[in-house]
Amino acid sequence: MTDKSIKELALSVGRPVEKLLEQVREAGLPQRTANDIITTEQQDTLVNHLKKIHGQESGAGKITLKRKTTSTAKVASTSGKAKTINVEVRKKHTFTKPNPEQIAAEAKARQETEERTRPQEQPRQAPQQQMRDESENKAQATLNAMRAAQQKETAKTTSTTTEVVVKRKSTNKPIKPVNVKQVETAEQRKAREAEAAKLKAVEETARRKAAEEAQQRTLEQMRKMASKYSTEETGATIRVIDDSPLAAGLVGQAYEDSFNQEDREIKRGGATNPRGQKKGGRNNQEEQSFKSHHKRGLKTSQANKHGFEKPVKKQVYDVEIGSTIVVADLAQKMAIKVREVIKTLMKMGELVTQNQSIDQDTAALVVEEMGHNPILVSDTQAEDNLLEAAEEARGEQTTRPPVVTIMGHVDHGKTSLLDRIRRSKVAAGEAGGITQHIGAYHVETDKGIITFLDTPGHAAFTAMRSRGAKATDIVVLVVAADDGVMPQTAEAIDHARAAGTPIIVAINKMDKESADPDRVLNELTTKQIVPEQWGGDVPVAMVSAHSGQGIDELLDLILIQSELMELKASGEGAAQGVVIEARVDKGRGAVTSILVQNGTLNIGDLVLAGSSYGRVRAMSDENGQPIKSAGPSIPVEILGLPDAPMAGDEVLVVNDEKKAREVADARADRERQKRIERQSAMRLENIMASMGKKDVPTVNVVLKADVRGTLEALTAALNELSMDEVRVRVISSGVGAITESDVTLAESSEAVLLGFNVRADTTARQKSDQDGIDIRYYSIIYELIDDVKNAMSGKLAPEHRETILGVAEVREVFHSSKFGAAAGCMVLEGMLHRNKPIRVLRDDVVVFQGELESLRRYKEVVEEVRAGMECGLAVKGYKDIKAKDKIEVYDVQLIKRSL
């Protein structure tokens, strides 16, 4: 690499100049513009920084191979026809070159282990080898004796045959003609054959007798060998006879030869009847059973004598039960079937399924009823153990900086006051000039170090203010001198009191002419906030964020209050803190803002936050500068968690990844169980409430926000907009950019897609343009809520408003052949219209409601008659009109409603 400018380096590596400048700043290099020169050493520093950020270390002995194969497969579709789909398989293998020093060390350790274990194995293997050798020698001697006996007995009978065969094989001369004198007679031949048969019978008897004696001797020797090596005198345990194939074969042969001819027939396939068929019925079944039994051999028959026996005494288990437990899990812990547990619950009056959860008390009664011992445990036992271990590992406590939360009503100058202290301009960067989420700032003043938490003042951010009050030591209540105590001011007072946090009042905007601090103090007194000037215990500072008036006095009050509280924490051991905010950044993943409360947080620590855990890959302060560690009362941003935790979750550094995974899984299970119970309860309530009612119009919303706290506040604000006539339903909510799946969900559920401080990616924009889905972006919470209100107003049914146009009194009633009863009337007020609806009133009571059939004046049909004029009219469908009745003409208008 050579020295080059930032612009040239960006072109060579294919990165945007702005992105490269940002990475250069993160690496701590001095270059700030595209024309600045970066040296070779600085380029190496930048590369090492990027590798460290992305979790990659330099390893020359590592290579990664990626393969991609494409194939097709046929699958059945819903129409019954097979369709072909493309299947792409991607494989990735990483090969690491072994280190020669490591290989040599492993070989040396393996050799030392073998040398240590060899002297120990030789004495242990010597008796077994000696026994095996003796067994093989005895078996070989027995086999040789049996063969010698058989050869000795049959030597006489086989010698003649062998000699004849040899002579026949060695004779090759032609056969001479037979002499007639040498031909024997028939009587001589019969005598010779009879003598040969007698000799053969004697030889057969002798041979059979010799074979039986040899077999008997072999059996006796094998029985002695089996008796010697098979079992001890007690017969309690079985020992292996021998491992040699020769001894095993001899014992097996002796065992087979111990059966008589009938048993051998049974073993070969059973006796046959005269027709050649096997005997059937029960006898044949017994023979087959006998055959299969004897095929197992000597070892199997001996082993079956010591098989498993069913225990007589019932096993009693210690069953651990949490706050809730699933019926199937409870049955598994007691080692019984699920139906038995369900039966017991039915006897107790509980109708449940195997996947349903029951409470701790009910589960304990079931366990006792089944005869086991219930042990009640806490669901947070593992978490408590981790906290106790972390507390024990901490060292001596020292004084720590105070954590101060600035609270108050919207637009009362909270962020501007904090800016004055920090000497920066943050409020101008907030959308709409209001704080949208909790901001954590670590400020080093001349008076000391103070950590400030800036909370939003809008009504929708109640949960954020509550979390800010719980995580703080001191609450600074900002009240505008020209506005006084407002609803969010009173709410902040309630949050501070609920958390037991001391309050310091800062009356802001004292530079305005309309400032009236006495009125503010009077209003605070009505909220039980009595200032020290009036004999109370609440410090009050008159400040102005614009001019800087009273800022030093406010800082003095904060530090004095922190000294009185004696705030201490340990800077050693595992870190413990709380999640201030969490968001998802594209390219960086989950970014979590943490306030460290105890211990020291370092890069590489294993962090457990809510139901997420992971190692800290990178850490930065509130200004985005990378740091390596953070002590108590210091806010930081970390990377490394797989997903964004909930704001307010407790953060703990653990050493054992297995325990961290167990605690995270347990928390996730509890959250999922609570969500399922809440949804089932809501469904049941909705079913009961909707019985007999019409469908209520609903505005479906898919919501995406930049941080968790803002998402929570927006969801709560939208749910509060629901009313009896129209409801708001948040179909899906999440943190991060709007994706294609969000657009698809909005299309399928006919929902409005809203993004707060986020944008849609390229795929999502293309999908929304194709499907005609409108994506709305917001940066101010007022605008988002107003648009949802307008959408709800469009779902409201219009209001029917009646306007009385005129009233006429019936003077005479005439009978007409065409209309029946016709009334002569005098218009008293307003105007009568022929095409408008009417009411007939008798003694100011409505007796008929309809329309006019005819309206005439001097026998001419007219459209309207004004007040003070006479007219004749006929009511359509009503003939019972009488004198002194009143005819009221009215009009109905549809008025569009709004929230």
Curated annotation (Swiss-Prot):
GO terms for molecular function: GTP binding; GTPase activity; translation initiation factor activity. Coiled coil: none annotated. Residues 399-568 form the tr-type G domain. The keyword GTP-binding applies. It holds the Pfam family IF-2. Residues 94-167, 259-309 are annotated as: Disordered. It is found in: Cytoplasm. Residues 147-164 have a biased composition (Low complexity). Residues 544-546 are annotated as: G5. PROSITE patterns: G_TR_2 (PS51722), IF2 (PS01176). GTP binds at residues 408-415, 454-458, 508-511. Residues 508-511 are annotated as: G4. Residues 433-437 are annotated as: G2. Residues 107-121 have a biased composition (Basic and acidic residues). Gene3D superfamilies: P-loop containing nucleotide triphosphate hydrolases, Putative DNA-binding domain, N-terminal subdomain of bacterial translation initiation factor IF2, Translation factors, Translation initiation factor IF- 2, domain 3. Keywords: Cytoplasm, GTP-binding, Initiation factor, Nucleotide-binding, Protein biosynthesis. One of its GO terms (cellular component) is cytosol. PANTHER family: TR-TYPE G DOMAIN-CONTAINING PROTEIN (PTHR43381:SF5), TRANSLATION INITIATION FACTOR IF-2-RELATED (PTHR43381). Belongs to the TRAFAC class translation factor GTPase superfamily. Classic translation factor GTPase family. IF-2 subfamily. One of the essential components for the initiation of protein synthesis. Protects formylmethionyl-tRNA from spontaneous hydrolysis and promotes its binding to the 30S ribosomal subunits. Also involved in the hydrolysis of GTP during the formation of the 70S ribosomal complex. This is Translation initiation factor IF-2. It comes from Acinetobacter baylyi (strain ATCC 33305 / BD413 / ADP1).
